[in-house]
Amino acid sequence: MPVSLARNAGMLSVAVLCGGSSPEREVSLAGGKRVADALGRLGYNATVLDLNRESVGQLLAMAPDLVYNALHGVQGEDGCVSGLLDILGLACTHSHVAASSVGMDKVLTKHVLKSLGIDFPKFDVLTKEELLSAKEVLPYPFVIKPVRGGSTIGVHAIFSKSEYLDLSAHADTLEDRMIVEEYVSGQEVQTAVFLGRAIGTMELLFEGRIYSYDAKYVEGLCEHIFPANLPYDIYNLTLEWALKLHQCLGCKTLSRVDFRYDVANKALKLLEINTHPGMTVSSTLPEVLWLRCGLNFDHVVDLIVQDALGIDDSRRAYIDELMGKTVSREPSHV
């Protein structure tokens, strides 16, 4: 059985908040269950709560030592729940209000990137009505995304005028505000940031124009390559940019930063940051931590919990030594 870093894990209660009403509900439920199972193996007293109108009363009655925020999407990872938990006086995992809110908003994130000198795709912001009227925007191809959303839900890659006109058939997937950005062909890569360090970058191989919902969550539709097959300087740039954005936003404990590398033009573009990375069996951040640092899923969950509770100095020294030994080594082929 895994052993928690917490000396008193068996006395600590953790409420795992997941589900909710966002389009990413199923992903959140899957990740939340996996986290709760890990907490149980570690000896914590874990309870799963599906976010709804009764959740505030349930949390106040439980008075858990910690709330593990396993929510995704609007109202889950956009700072709403973090702010609510702050008001209730309950400690929680993951980034707090400001970092979560800005990180969830793709437009605000791009303005932060500009201030940091980090390259990103050209973009514009349109309303749903403007998109459905086929207003001329960027040159083809381009990608349409909800300003606030994840799991590639409501994302469309548009390569021609006819595809743009066909968007009306998918009107139900469009939000009131949508971001339109240039399509960057090339390698899709993701960088894991954990406990103040950029850990490593993974490459994703899949069929199609974009890293779709099915490619993310259906077994066998995406191949994970670690470390990413990038030029040495580009690989290191993913680490540098990911950590810089994580720190600038004030992210807590962990984040995942997504990139596209345009091989033909040797250009790296930062797409977005996820302050609440997935924890399903196909999620990349736990996999990178295993392949790069030897941290299994239970250990990762334990570290997230302990970082939220405040790791004591002796345990922090152990973690720093562990992470330092693994992260200081460059991947062999980059």
UniProtKB/Swiss-Prot annotation:
Sample GO molecular function, one term: metal ion binding
Subcellular location: Cytoplasm
Pathway(s) served: Cell wall biogenesis; peptidoglycan biosynthesis
Pfam families: Dala_Dala_lig_C (PF07478)
Gene Ontology biological-process annotations: cell wall organization; peptidoglycan biosynthetic process; regulation of cell shape
Chain residues that bind ATP: 138-190
Residues annotated as transmembrane: none
SUPFAM superfamilies for the chain: Glutathione synthetase ATP-binding domain-like (SSF56059), PreATP-grasp domain (SSF52440)
Chemical reaction(s) catalysed: 2 D-alanine + ATP = D-alanyl-D-alanine + ADP + phosphate + H(+)
Keyword terms of this UniProt record: ATP-binding, Cell shape, Cell wall biogenesis/degradation, Cytoplasm, Ligase, Magnesium, Manganese, Metal-binding, Nucleotide-binding, Peptidoglycan synthesis
Binding site for Mg(2+) 2: E272, N274
Binding positions for Mg(2+) 1 per the UniProt entry: D258, E272
EC number, as in UniProt: 6.3.2.4
Domain ATP-grasp: 110-306
Bound cofactor: record note: Binds 2 magnesium or manganese ions per subunit.
Cofactor dependency: Mg(2+); Mn(2+)
Similarity section: Belongs to the D-alanine--D-alanine ligase family.
UniProt-listed PANTHER family: D-ALANINE--D-ALANINE LIGASE, D-ALANINE--D-ALANINE LIGASE B
Role description: Cell wall formation.
Name used for this protein in its record: D-alanine--D-alanine ligase
Organism in which the protein naturally occurs: Anaplasma marginale (strain Florida)
